[in-house]
Amino acid sequence: MDSDDEVVEEAVEGHLDDDGLPHGFCTVTYSSTDRFEGNFVHGEKNGRGKFFFFDGSTLEGYYVDDALQGQGVYTYEDGGVLQGTYVDGELNGPAQEYDSDGRLIFKGQYKDNNRHGVCWIHYPDGGSLVGEVNEDGEMTGEKIAYVYPDQRTALYGKFIDGEMLEGKLATLMATEEGRPHFEVTSGSSVYHFDKSTSSCISSDALLPDPYESERVYVADSLISSAGEGLFSKVAVGPNTVMSFYNGVRITHQEVDSRDWALNGNTLSLDEETVIDVPEPYNHVSKYCASLGHKANHSFTPNCVYDLFVHPRFGPIKCIRTLRAVEAEEELTVAYGYDHSPPGKSGPEAPEWYQVELKAFQATQQK
């Protein structure tokens, strides 16, 4: 992102002045294989120009006396973009960063190429971190907050490099010129980063999530023989995060090697990890820190599993609405068992699912 790294000029395509220096529009290739295309005045970059770096990233902007000045656009090799303000070739001032899908992931200030002042880090799931970064540009301090996807519910307190050490429930009351104003809830419980392991689901299994508690509750399912289900407390629109699916973290190999009866609350997180809510934690009297495992299956679901970076649980999955949902409506998801595993005649799924699948397919054929 720094526009004036020390590089040795190797080849010039374009007009040269009487001293053999680039003059006018030229393409200059450096010993590092970085390339610059733009306007020169007697060997110095002046006017519009663009660096093409060896790793596939680029930097484009307006140069004055060989240094990038004003608005510049740095494009990462993966397609992400940083739009920032440059002074004498260094990031100084407001900046915004977007991922390769065009989603805003950072908004704040830079000083001498480091993040500075109050900054916002936005996650793809809708949550965000906000606070005044330290001298290294890290979210470290005692006035940092994680803000849930509703942009109102927050956990405010002490963080180190974005990890919550001690957070209390707070409400984001207003944001003025990028600076948030929080009101901490009196008598709030204290939350901290508490990522599960293969043997520990949570250090405080009965401490509910404050965001989830406002949106869902557990009651007897309306689906026959399904036991308990997950219901919405409030009417919400589509694409709303409703609940979180935390659990112990085990391997796919462990899940595949055991009986289906033990896999009633397993959910794949990624290629290595499966989240599981085993006995006795499937009972809310033993575990209620998250409730996403209570959502039952439907072939016509109103919700979907989605990835989520949680301030307390770390990388997990959440339950997000597919459509508008009414208050008191049961939330359902498609469990997504493999209907056509290689070398097998039927779905790789528990018996109850296979029975429901046949019944659903029969209704679709009518």
Swiss-Prot record:
SUPFAM superfamilies: Histone H3 K4-specific methyltransferase SET7/9 N-terminal domain, SET domain. Its main location: nucleus. S-adenosyl-L-methionine binds at residues 226-228, 296-297, 356. Pfam families: MORN (PF02493), SET (PF00856), SET7_N (PF22648). Keywords: Activator, Chromatin regulator, Chromosome, Methyltransferase, Nucleus, Repeat, S-adenosyl-L-methionine, Transcription, Transcription regulation, Transferase. GO terms for biological process: chromatin organization; DNA damage response; heterochromatin organization; peptidyl-lysine dimethylation; peptidyl-lysine monomethylation; positive regulation of DNA-templated transcription; regulation of DNA repair; response to ethanol. It comes from the Eukaryota. One of its GO terms (molecular function) is chromatin binding. CDD domains: SET_SETD7. Residues 214-336 form the SET domain. Belongs to the class V-like SAM-binding methyltransferase superfamily. Histone-lysine methyltransferase family. SET7 subfamily. Histone methyltransferase that specifically monomethylates 'Lys-4' of histone H3. H3 'Lys-4' methylation represents a specific tag for epigenetic transcriptional activation. Plays a central role in the transcriptional activation of genes such as collagenase or insulin. Recruited by IPF1/PDX-1 to the insulin promoter, leading to activate transcription. Also has methyltransferase activity toward non-histone proteins such as CGAS, p53/TP53, TAF10, and possibly TAF7 by recognizing and binding the [KR]-[STA]-K in substrate proteins. The SET domain is necessary but not sufficient for histone methyltransferase activity. This is Histone-lysine N-methyltransferase SETD7. The gene is Setd7.
